[in-house]
Amino acid sequence: MTASALVAVLCVGVMPMTRVGRARERGETQGFMKVLVDAQTERILGASLLCIEGDEIVHSLLDVMAAGASYRVVQRAVHIHPTVSELIPTLLGQLVPLPPLPPLPPLPPVPPVPPLQA
């Protein structure tokens, strides 16, 4: 397998808490929600939930990750209103591709190992 075959196309969705009605209602608009998705498999690779109710939101994302299911499962789910987690479908609907990383420089040669002394 070549190195280029190992490169995944990643997508990211970010939502500031200033756009979340429940957070505005509580006056806790600091922070954000961010999700990283493999575009080819549609699997959620990770999330950063630096926000109010992040400890509750994470469970729906973890369930989809543990099941190896597509992010579309949680995107299409019915979320209760008014909650912070009701914005997960909107967050996942805003996924955009990340630019590819530059190639890594070649590794330096490995020096020879001296023979063992008896």
Stretches with model-predicted labels:
Residues 4-118:
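Flexible, glycine-rich terminal cap/loop adjacent to redox cofactors
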